[in-house]
Structure formats: C-alpha cells, structure tokens
Amino acid sequence: DVEGLSYKAGDKYKASAKGKSNQPVCFIDSTGRTYSLPAHTLPSARGQGEPLSGRVSPPSGASFMAAVMGKDKDAYLMSTDAGYGFVVRYADLLANKKAGKTVLNVPKGARVLSPQPIASTADDRIALVSNEGRLLVFPVSELPEMVRGKGNKMMSIPGARVAERVEFVQDVQVVGPDDALTLYAGKRHLTLKAGDLEHYYGERGRRGAKLPRGFQNVDAMSVERKG
C-alpha cells in the first residue's frame, strides 16, 4: 500500500508506478517536461525517499505531476485539462538529460493530466469528464500518435475559460471495449457499464453529454477492467 508508506513531515502520497527494477521510471512535471531515472537507483521503500530535484533539474516553479513505467512500445495518452491530447510511445517519453525534455505543450492556464496507459489503440476509447458535468467518450484511434506537441482537441472547451479556470477537463481515463467506468462525486459514485457508456459516445472535439443530476460535480473516475 503506497499510501501507507512512511513519509517525511509535510510530505504525502502523490503518484506511483508499477514496474521492474531493471526498467527506467519516467516522471512528468507541470510544464510538460519528462525525466527518466533507472528504477534500481531510487531509494528503497524502507526509507523516506529523497527529493527528485536532487536527481533531475526541472524549470523553476515546476512540480512533478505523475510517474509511469512501461515497455518501449507501450502506448500512453498524454493530455492537459484544456482538452488536448495525443498518443505517445513509452520510449519517446524517456529523457537522457538531467534537464529532461518537453513532450507536452501546455496551453495557458492549463494543467497536465496523468498519462493513461492504452492497451489497444484500435479498440480502446477515451473518456473525459469536465468540471461542468459533461462526459465524452470517443475512440483512441481518432487521436494522432506523436513524440511531442500540444495534441489534438479532445473536448471542446474555449481557451479563455481554461485560462480563467472556469471550465476544464476534471479527469480522463482510457476504457476497453468491455470495461466499466466509475465516476466519483463527493461520497456518491456511479458505475457505467460498456452499454451505458454508449449514451456518451461522440466525435472527438465535441462538448460531451450532461451526466445525471447528482453526478455533475465529478471528482475523479476509475476503470474496472474486464478480460
């Protein structure tokens, strides 16, 4: 249980990644830069860790947002809460330099969302929920595969509303053909099975359909894998 590990005073759980000790770990910061370190060089879980800033050199004011581990050809969704994203291979996330490299261009006022693993670029779908209670589900195949950039528009949100933090993508997940998607709103949750999700299918770049009352202030989503 990573959230139950021992942390230094003032520290708390942020993100975790599962992998093997002979693999590199990729870290993504708030400016869209990525950094990679050999997993076996990181401190063991018996201690309280060490600052990442001692191993890599992020820009001033940047904060680390996520960590991922995978195989070179594994596909991931890179996106921002401005509603833009693209597909990238794990090998293209890795950076040899201490200063890392820019992979994701972040629009003004937008925030980086955690990379999401894609099992099948042909069959999987992307589910986005906005802070205004709209859900949009469309095929991963409608997004380009890139090594860096801003990506394509996934959900229609005016840039000015993102910059003012009035409207933005609250969360994004990748769902398989038979997967179920659970939405969390306060103490309530709503599970949408594969058939239920069809109501929210739409073309990439649309606004999405309104969720039922009581579930229009979604905090987060999770995927229940089937098969």
Task: Identify the residue ranges that each predicted region occupies.
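Short, structured "edge-of-domain" segments at secondary-structure transitions
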Residues: 1-227
